[in-house]
Each structure stands twice: as structure tokens, then as C-alpha cells.
Amino acid sequence: MHFRAITRIVGLLVILFSGTMIIPGLVALIYRDGAGRAFTQTFFVALAIGSMLWWPNRKEKGELKSREGFLIVVLFWTVLGSVGALPFIFSESPNLTITDAFFESFSGLTTTGATTLVGLDSLPHAILFYRQMLQWFGGMGIIVLAVAILPILGVGGMQLYRAEMPGPLKDNKMRPRIAETAKTLWLIYVLLTVACALALWFAGMDAFDAIGHSFATIAIGGFSTHDASIGYFDSPTINTIIAIFLLISGCNYGLHFSLLSGRSLKVYWRDPEFRMFIGVQFTLVVICTLVLWFHNVYSSALMTINQAFFQVVSMATTAGFTTDSIARWPLFLPVLLLCSAFIGGCAGSTGGGLKVIRILLLFKQGNRELKRLVHPNAVYSIKLGNRALPERILEAVWGFFSAYALVFIVSMLAIIATGVDDFSAFASVVATLNNLGPGLGVVADNFTSMNPVAKWILIANMLFGRLEVFTLLVLFTPTFWRE
């Protein structure tokens, strides 16, 4: 294990991250909200930490194997999540405990969108902007992680598209491929953000809110600059714009990449995962619309469709924006939408959850087992598009599902053990492990009332969800650390 080479990379990441503190610092200057000092302090502290890690190891550029890759990916999220908590700790408004500061930072960076803050409307603009920016940078990291890095390590939903896994990865060989892909993906990400911000601005948001909400939308994060979330704007047009951009961001960025490379729009419909993703969203919208209409929750049919469309897409893509307290909907719907977050977005998107591709393959495997019961001697292969998938891929899906279920059950029991009621414990684990954000019960709006121990368990859940479980779990195996 090349610890010095890893330390060099982590140090460099922290130095780069310290530079991002300048942006909310400028926002504090523009709005004169007095929050600038927290970002100035964080800038110097992060720069010092990064330099101490990078400078002694700056010449270490040894060969990086996939083992080092796992450690770098986990350290990326844990170190930046910890450094990201500093502005909340240094800030006078909001006055957060260390636990709450870490919770807020990790929730932003993993694009979970769960919050411990109340009274957002009265907070300094710089702090509000920083929360949105954390999600945007988190989403940026996720895209590169999901499409360019995890497949090389043999983990993650995108691995299902690429059965071949390369052997030892030399630092210099790995860099151009990842850097090249990352540049194009980031270009798509930035273009979508600009388009979303402009659309929201034209729809009536002011520039600050439009930029902030475009950050959280494209990252499928769910943080808002208002306590009432998107409901603050009370605009069906804004609801529709956000829902459309959430659907675009919930797609596999590899498909957007293909479109940018000159392929036709048919590339989307040819993808079985995309078809299932749209099918799930459509089915949920129809169910929600009918139930809301039947219970006369809204006064008009158009309002019912708009609210159902927005809330379904927001929850099913794991963004977690709200327009209305869905707790006042018939109980069946909030529970259905919470469960839809288990499916989440497509592989290679900023969405959370198990990912559509895995659910699709689990269905296909279930179907194959039913056929085998009828024809025990027949040989059935599982295809994705026109390509038969090797058994190793299918074993990986079951392995992931088992690990996910294990983390889910252990987390839920641990939270119940801290004194939280069972329904809220279930909802909070669903909300954090799937990177959804809001839950039900005591965590329907925020996580303020959760006890500190439960909050740390939920922070770990956010990381497990974001790093596709295995990436983090592999670090706890003795084999990983053996030379």
C-alpha cells in the first residue's frame, strides 16, 4: 500500500477544496451578511492541512493499484466531508454543535439533503450558498466516481455495463483516461446547471435562488434556501422545470456523453435501464395522481397532476425536494414514495438508491428462476439489450443486495437502540442510505430532534449509500490490509 502517494493525492484534494471557500466568501461580501470570517478561517485551516499532507510527499508518484483506489475514494469523501464541516463550526449563525456541523457537511457532499437546520430564511446568504455549493461539488465528484473510477475498481452500477476489469493500474495510465472522461462529464454537468439556473430565473426565481436550486437539482441533492423548500415559490412552472431537470440528472451520464459525441436521441430509448427508469416514474405519477384525486387533496385536476409529478420525481430520483408537506397526503403515498427511493436513479447518475439497473437485473433473475422451475433442464441466459451477461456480474448484483440489506438492518437496529421510535428509525435509514434526504415520522422535515449517536450512524449511512456500500465495506476486511 503506497500510503505516501495516497497522502499526496488527499493533500492536493484538500488544497483544491480550500480554494472553493473563496466563492461563499465573495457571496458574504456582496450581501454583507457577516458570514465571511468563517470561510476565511476555513480557507487558511484547509490550506494548512492540505499543504502539510502534500508537501512532504509531493514527489511520491508510485504505482497505484485498485486497493489504493478504494482508499483514495473513501478518503476523498471522509476528509472533504470533515473539512467541509469547518464553516458551520466557525460560523456564529447558525450556531451548530460539532455533530450537527458534520451532519450538514456530509449530507451536502453526499447529496443526501437531510438537514439539522431550521430557520433557513433568516440565515446569512453565504451559509445558504455554501450548502448548495457543497451539493454541487459532491454531485460533480459522484459523476466522475460512478462513470470513470468505480468501474475500474470493479464496483458500482456502471460495472454492469463493463464486464472487463483491468489489472494493476499505473498512475500515469489511469490518469489520462479518467481525466479525459471527467472533463467531458463535467462539461455536461456545468451546461445542465447553467440551463437549469436560467430556466428557474425566467420562471420567476431571483438570481440567488435560481443558482442555488440549480446546484441542488443537477446534483439531485435536495437542499433549499428556504424552510418551505420548493413550496416557498408556490409555482407550478418552477415545479415542472425542477422535475424535468431531475429526470435528466437521474439518467446515466454515459447516455448524455453519447449524445454529446454525436449519437442520436435514440441512444436513450435503446437503453433498457432508461426505459425502466421512465416506466417507474410514469407508473408512480399515475398512482399518486389517482389517489390524490380520489381523496380530493387538491382543488383542481391540473394542480393534482403537477403536485404528483413533482413529488414523485423528487422522491424517486432521491432529490427530496418538497412543495407541500406530503405527511398530509393519504399515508399510502408517503410510504410508497419513500420506498421508491430504494430504486433511485440510473447507474452513472447523481441519484442515490440501489440503482435501476440492479433492480432490473434482480427482476430478470427472478423471472429466470420461475422459468427454471417449469423447465429444469433448459439453459437461460440473462441479457441486457442484446448482450448476455456473465454469471459473475449477476453474482455481484446479489452480493451488493445482500451487503445493502445487512447495512440497512444493522443501522436501523442501532438507531432504535439509541431510543428513536421504530418508524422514524426505518424512515431515517431509508432517507440516508438512499441519499434521499427527508424521511417520515420525526424526520419528515429535518433531523434536528435525532440524538447525536443516531446522527453519527446516519452520517455513516450517507457514506455507505454514496460509495455503493462495497467501496466502504471492503476497508473493514483483513484481506484488504494484507500485503
Swiss-Prot record:
<feature type="intramembrane region" description="Helical; Pore-forming">
    <location>
        <begin position="422"/>
        <end position="432"/>
    </location>
</feature>
<feature type="topological domain" description="Periplasmic">
    <location>
        <begin position="225"/>
        <end position="234"/>
    </location>
</feature>
<feature type="topological domain" description="Periplasmic">
    <location>
        <begin position="30"/>
        <end position="35"/>
    </location>
</feature>
<feature type="intramembrane region">
    <location>
        <begin position="420"/>
        <end position="421"/>
    </location>
</feature>
<feature type="topological domain" description="Periplasmic">
    <location>
        <begin position="440"/>
        <end position="451"/>
    </location>
</feature>
<keyword id="KW-0479">Metal-binding</keyword>
<feature type="intramembrane region">
    <location>
        <begin position="317"/>
        <end position="322"/>
    </location>
</feature>
<feature type="intramembrane region">
    <location>
        <position position="206"/>
    </location>
</feature>
<feature type="intramembrane region" description="Helical; Pore-forming">
    <location>
        <begin position="98"/>
        <end position="109"/>
    </location>
</feature>
<feature type="intramembrane region" description="Note=Loop between two helices">
    <location>
        <begin position="343"/>
        <end position="355"/>
    </location>
</feature>
<feature type="binding site">
    <location>
        <position position="436"/>
    </location>
    <ligand>
        <name>K(+)</name>
    </ligand>
</feature>
<dbReference type="GO" id="GO:0015379">
    <property type="term" value="F:potassium:chloride symporter activity"/>
</dbReference>
<keyword id="KW-0633">Potassium transport</keyword>
<feature type="topological domain" description="Periplasmic">
    <location>
        <begin position="203"/>
        <end position="205"/>
    </location>
</feature>
<dbReference type="InterPro" id="IPR003445">
    <property type="entry name" value="Cat_transpt"/>
</dbReference>
<dbReference type="Pfam" id="PF02386">
    <property type="entry name" value="TrkH"/>
</dbReference>
<feature type="transmembrane region" description="Helical">
    <location>
        <begin position="66"/>
        <end position="90"/>
    </location>
</feature>
<feature type="intramembrane region">
    <location>
        <begin position="110"/>
        <end position="115"/>
    </location>
</feature>
<feature type="topological domain" description="Cytoplasmic">
    <location>
        <begin position="1"/>
        <end position="2"/>
    </location>
</feature>
<dbReference type="GO" id="GO:0015079">
    <property type="term" value="F:potassium ion transmembrane transporter activity"/>
</dbReference>
<dbReference type="InterPro" id="IPR004772">
    <property type="entry name" value="TrkH"/>
</dbReference>
<keyword id="KW-1003">Cell membrane</keyword>
<protein>
    <recommendedName>
        <fullName>Trk system potassium uptake protein TrkH</fullName>
    </recommendedName>
</protein>
<feature type="intramembrane region" description="Helical">
    <location>
        <begin position="452"/>
        <end position="463"/>
    </location>
</feature>
<feature type="topological domain" description="Cytoplasmic">
    <location>
        <begin position="151"/>
        <end position="177"/>
    </location>
</feature>
<keyword id="KW-0406">Ion transport</keyword>
<feature type="region of interest" description="Selectivity filter part 1">
    <location>
        <begin position="110"/>
        <end position="115"/>
    </location>
</feature>
<keyword id="KW-0812">Transmembrane</keyword>
<dbReference type="GO" id="GO:0005886">
    <property type="term" value="C:plasma membrane"/>
</dbReference>
<feature type="binding site">
    <location>
        <position position="435"/>
    </location>
    <ligand>
        <name>K(+)</name>
    </ligand>
</feature>
<keyword id="KW-0407">Ion channel</keyword>
<feature type="topological domain" description="Periplasmic">
    <location>
        <begin position="116"/>
        <end position="124"/>
    </location>
</feature>
<feature type="transmembrane region" description="Helical">
    <location>
        <begin position="178"/>
        <end position="202"/>
    </location>
</feature>
<feature type="intramembrane region" description="Helical">
    <location>
        <begin position="235"/>
        <end position="250"/>
    </location>
</feature>
<feature type="transmembrane region" description="Helical">
    <location>
        <begin position="36"/>
        <end position="57"/>
    </location>
</feature>
<feature type="intramembrane region">
    <location>
        <begin position="433"/>
        <end position="439"/>
    </location>
</feature>
<feature type="transmembrane region" description="Helical">
    <location>
        <begin position="3"/>
        <end position="29"/>
    </location>
</feature>
<feature type="binding site">
    <location>
        <position position="111"/>
    </location>
    <ligand>
        <name>K(+)</name>
    </ligand>
</feature>
<comment type="similarity">
    <text>Belongs to the TrkH potassium transport family.</text>
</comment>
<feature type="topological domain" description="Periplasmic">
    <location>
        <begin position="323"/>
        <end position="330"/>
    </location>
</feature>
<feature type="binding site">
    <location>
        <position position="220"/>
    </location>
    <ligand>
        <name>K(+)</name>
    </ligand>
</feature>
<comment type="function">
    <text>Low-affinity potassium transport system. Interacts with Trk system potassium uptake protein TrkA. Requires TrkE (sapD) for transport activity, 20% more uptake is seen with both SapD and SapF. Transport in the absence of SapD and SapF is dependent on a high membrane potential and a high cytoplasmic ATP concentration, suggesting this protein may be able to interact with other ATP-binding proteins. Can transport potassium and rubidium.</text>
</comment>
